[in-house]
From Swiss-Prot:
Native source species: Oryza sativa subsp. japonica
Protein name in UniProt: Allene oxide synthase 3
Origin superkingdom: Eukaryota
Binding site for substrate: F297, N298, K304, P365, V366, E367, F368
InterPro entries listed in its UniProt record: Cyt_P450 (IPR001128), Cyt_P450_E_grp-IV (IPR002403), Cyt_P450_sf (IPR036396)
Pathway info: Lipid metabolism; oxylipin biosynthesis
Length: 500
């Protein structure tokens, strides 16, 4: 028996319906899985899971598993009540969907640096720093132009300033090696002075502000970030009450910030003078608050997190990698040369460069990216597509995106030569998936995008750290204890360069 004739109109409608369920790339469009639960109570429960009962990575992995491997999910993000008015986000947990957050035409990043809450502007002299401005804001380009010009003009000071900081830091490590020596504390102490020397020159804050300069800087950072900090206060119920329930009052760090600001007003006077002559349209006091933020939050805060992670991975890799790095460094800059390691020299060290990029892939200094959808859009993961509505908060957890097994072989492992052409696990084309700087490593920051204006300086400091370490030492050993934000690294032995 012949089948009934098909009405051409019905067939066309069916075909149109099928097409409407596919994304432009041909992926099936699905409803975003997950949910937000009961207002107040579910965000509170999720906050406890995130900080204490599961930890950040397991918080996301467990929800991915719960929803059949979907990597675009609806979840609550801390801090939740009472600091955050709306904890609801659409989480992007794979390399493909995450890239939406790097497209400034698709996301609005005004006031999203820290996520679902905005620190009080009283912490920033009443101003909104560059990092909290959307790329479309006219002030963004004006301020970023000054910051990028500063970073470019001071790049030739980075290597000598770092060399001095490294020597002082590791002289202190060696002096304390009768017992275990914690790297993190020394790193904080010397990297604040390095940051200011590299960016502005002049007397370091440890001399002008005094020994309390680092303490004041850390207190100012803590008052911004305490809603998303954890395992700082024990027991955890007390931490919940003190750090995650209400915003700490800015007046408690007003005096310390005033001392730091006074230091930068003098140290950065030439930069501020030049900006005024260039008629940037940004008042001097506002630009000063921005320079304080760039130096302490972006630069010093980044080095505080990033360098312990580099040392962690080197410590775990052991003597075999150490020997390869020492050979490469000393072949490029012999230990007897007085000029020291330059940026041009580390550019000729492919393994050193790869180690730094791999550390940035495994542990990006800023783990999160946030942005509001500028319009209704379709977000694609590897396997499906999802409709997002205008105004929804998009969130990316970068450690999952940059360890995506569909992009990287041995994605969860530290592979030292991953970015060496012809290396064991790949080569340079993978760099576009290293996105720690709020943009691909293959792209440059500009006035019109949200990529880190100090991207090149951060990478340079990482390379100098590795190169200086293996110019001075053959190998080292250290204990590593994982902790939120950064690992605690304790040196137990250092073996001086045999040819030194």
């Amino acid at each position: 028996m012949a089948p009934p004739p098909v009405n051409s109109g019905d067939a066309a409608a069916a075909a149109t319906g099928e097409k409407s369920k596919l994304s432009p790339s041909g992926l099936p469009i699905r409803e975003i899985p997950g949910g937000y639960g009961v207002p107040f109570f579910s965000p509170l429960r999720d906050r406890l899971d995130y900080f204490y009962f599961q930890g950040a990575e397991e918080y996301f992995r467990s929800r991915v598993a719960r929803h059949g491997g979907a990597t675009v999910l609806r979840v609550n993000m801390p801090p939740g009540p009472f600091i955050s008015g709306n904890p609801r986000v659409v989480a992007l947990l794979d390399a493909r969907s995450f890239r939406v957050l790097l497209d400034d035409s698709m996301v609005d990043k005004a006031d999203t640096l820290d996520g679902t809450y905005m620190p009080s502007r009283a912490l920033f002299g009443g101003h909104r720093p560059l990092a909290f401005l959307d790329a479309a804001d006219p002030r963004h380009a004006k301020i970023k132009r000054v910051v990028m010009s500063l970073a470019a003009a001071r790049m030739h000071h980075v290597a000598p300033a770092f060399r001095a900081a490294f020597a002082a830091m590791f002289d202190a490590v060696e002096a304390g090696l009768g017992a275990a020596v914690e790297f993190n504390k020394l790193n904080m102490r010397y990297m604040l002075d390095f940051t200011c020397a590299a960016l502005f020159g002049g007397e370091p804050p440890s001399k002008v502000v005094g020994d309390g300069a680092v303490t004041k800087a850390m207190a100012w950072l803590a008052f911004q970030l305490h809603p998303i900090a954890s395992k700082v206060v024990k027991p955890w119920p007390l931490e919940e009450l003190l750090l995650h329930t209400f915003s700490l009052p800015p007046f408690l760090v007003r005096r310390g910030y005033a001392d730091l600001k006074a230091y930068f007003a003098d140290a950065a006077a030439a930069v501020l003078d030049d900006a005024e002559k260039s008629h940037t349209g940004i008042p001097r006091d506002e630009l000063l608050d921005n320079l304080v933020f760039v130096a302490i939050f972006n630069a010093f805060g980044g080095f505080k997190i990033f360098l312990p992670h580099i040392v962690k991975w080197l410590a775990r890799a052991g003597p075999e990698l150490h020997a390869k790095l020492a050979t490469e460094v000393r072949a490029t800059v012999p230990t007897g040369e007085d000029d020291g390691i330059t940026l041009a020299a580390v550019e000729r060290m492919p393994l050193v460069k790869s180690v730094v990029w791999e550390a940035l892939r495994m542990n990006p200094p800023v783990e999160f990216q946030y942005g509001h959808a500028r319009r209704d859009m379709v977000v694609e993961s590897h396997d499906a597509a999802y409709e997002v509505r205008k105004g929804e908060m998009l969130f990316g957890y970068q450690p999952l995106a940059t360890r995506d097994e569909k992009v990287f072989d041995r994605a969860g492992e530290f592979v030292a030569d991953r970015f060496v052409a012809g290396g064991a696990a790949g080569d340079r084309p993978l760099l576009e998936h290293v996105v720690w700087s709020n943009g691909p490593e293959t792209r440059a920051p500009s006035e019109g995008n949200k990529q880190c204006p100090g991207k090149d300086m951060v990478v340079a400091v990482g390379r100098l750290m590795v190169a200086e370490l293996f110019r001075r030492y053959d190998t080292f050993a250290a204990d590593v204890v994982e902790a939120p934000v950064e690992p605690v690294v304790t040196f137990t032995s250092l073996t001086r360069a045999s040819s030194g």
